[in-house]
Amino acid sequence: MSGQPKRLMVMAGGTGGHVFPGLAVAHHLMAQGWQVRWLGTADRMEADLVPKHGIDIDFIRISGLRGKGVKALLAAPLRIFNAWRQARAIMKRFKPDVVLGMGGYVSGPGGLAAWSLGIPVVLHEQNGIAGLTNQWLAKIATTVMQAFPGAFPNAEVVGNPVRTDVLALPLPQVRLAGRDGPIRVLVVGGSQGARVLNQTMPQVAARLGDTVTIWHQSGKGAQLTVEQAYAGAGQPQHKVTEFIDDMAAAYAWADVVVCRSGALTVSEIAAAGLPAIFVPFQHKDRQQYWNALPLENAGAAKIFEQPQFTVEAVADTLAGWSREALLTMAERARAVSIPDATERVASEVSRVART
């Protein structure tokens, strides 16, 4: 029996911030001979994405409760119980040596099912503020890890696993050496875009004129509107795309990034070694603010809460950063990153499976 490969079940779903780090760890362990299956939901992004990575996926029925009506809240205990039963049946079939919770609603019943079967639970919190699911799963987990300090009081800080092509980028002092001309500004709103970026950055471009060149990722369905906004501001030369398929190439091109501060975005920007202007999504727990704060504290970024993200403030900030200042910020960003996060998480999963 000792010669059989170890088995891991990854529990992650809903958003790329949960799924992509889970995939990085899964591939790392699969390369070491592990058998990996995924626990997710059939109506979220993992349903299509995970099988494309050569990983079998099992589904349970669960969704979030935030913003739902009274009837949904009253039905929640039964829904969670049913999801727990589904997850428990899946794990009894697969018999994982360890489960890895990377976040999303699926981790709740999945983690509870594993615990009830005596399967060790390893948690990884991607954000600077722990989500509700991980807050209570931490009470039964064998190990809890965190990407940023402060999500849990005593958890090891291991960073966020990021894509290998981002980690493979040359260091800032190599990549940016000898670069001149207009400052290259990469604007990233995510797959859904960010209205505040789409509305503000064309006017910022008008103020800065030919001192900047912009690559603006607008999000689904917004490309034409944003192109028209740049043209209306007298700046039609800037590049607008709905999506960016190769983020590593975009990071390599950029001198500075303007973006939201989701956990994975912040970790990728640090790993790439890039200065940033972060505009945290407004949420009551200020999760994205806390994600970005370590980079601002390191002198690698500037945070603008959304009400302060004005044309004047952003234009003045960008105009005030020389190429020398941007290189210093880029080096500070890289210094904050934890480029071996994938290996750290995988190593802890392996350790727990052996004990």
From Swiss-Prot:
UniProtKB keywords: Cell cycle, Cell division, Cell inner membrane, Cell membrane, Cell shape, Cell wall biogenesis/degradation, Glycosyltransferase, Membrane, Peptidoglycan synthesis, Transferase
So what EC number does this one have? 2.4.1.227
Pfam families (alphabetical): Glyco_tran_28_C, Glyco_transf_28
Q: Please give one Gene Ontology molecular function term for this protein.
A: UDP-N-acetyl-D-glucosamine:N-acetylmuramoyl-L-alanyl-D-glutamyl-meso-2,6-diaminopimelyl-D-alanyl-D-alanine-diphosphoundecaprenol 4-beta-N-acetylglucosaminlytransferase activity
Subcellular location(s) per record? Cell inner membrane
Q: How does it sit in the membrane?
A: Peripheral membrane protein
Q: Which GO terms describe its cellular component?
A: plasma membrane
What does the entry give for GO biological process?
carbohydrate metabolic process; cell division; cell wall organization; lipid glycosylation; peptidoglycan biosynthetic process; regulation of cell shape
The primary location reported for this protein is membrane
User: What is its pathway?
Assistant: Cell wall biogenesis; peptidoglycan biosynthesis
Sites where the protein binds UDP-N-acetyl-alpha-D-glucosamine: 15-17, 127, 163, 191, 244, 263-268, 288
The record lists the catalysed reaction(s) as:
di-trans,octa-cis-undecaprenyl diphospho-N-acetyl-alpha-D-muramoyl-L-alanyl-D-glutamyl-meso-2,6-diaminopimeloyl-D-alanyl-D-alanine + UDP-N-acetyl-alpha-D-glucosamine = di-trans,octa-cis-undecaprenyl diphospho-[N-acetyl-alpha-D-glucosaminyl-(1->4)]-N-acetyl-alpha-D-muramoyl-L-alanyl-D-glutamyl-meso-2,6-diaminopimeloyl-D-alanyl-D-alanine + UDP + H(+)
Query: Which Gene3D superfamilies does the UniProt record give?
Result: Glycogen Phosphorylase B
Q: What does this protein do?
A: Cell wall formation. Catalyzes the transfer of a GlcNAc subunit on undecaprenyl-pyrophosphoryl-MurNAc-pentapeptide (lipid intermediate I) to form undecaprenyl-pyrophosphoryl-MurNAc-(pentapeptide)GlcNAc (lipid intermediate II).
> PANTHER family from the entry?
GLYCOSYLTRANSFERASE, UDP-N-ACETYLGLUCOSAMINE--N-ACETYLMURAMYL-(PENTAPEPTIDE) PYROPHOSPHORYL-UNDECAPRENOL N-ACETYLGLUCOSAMINE TRANSFERASE 1
Please give the NCBIfam families that the UniProt record associates with this protein. Answer: murG (TIGR01133)
Membership in a protein family: Belongs to the glycosyltransferase 28 family. MurG subfamily.
What protein name applies here? UDP-N-acetylglucosamine--N-acetylmuramyl-(pentapeptide) pyrophosphoryl-undecaprenol N-acetylglucosamine transferase
Q: Which organism is it from?
A: Salmonella typhimurium (strain LT2 / SGSC1412 / ATCC 700720)
User: Lineage of this protein's species?
Assistant: Bacteria, Pseudomonadati, Pseudomonadota, Gammaproteobacteria, Enterobacterales
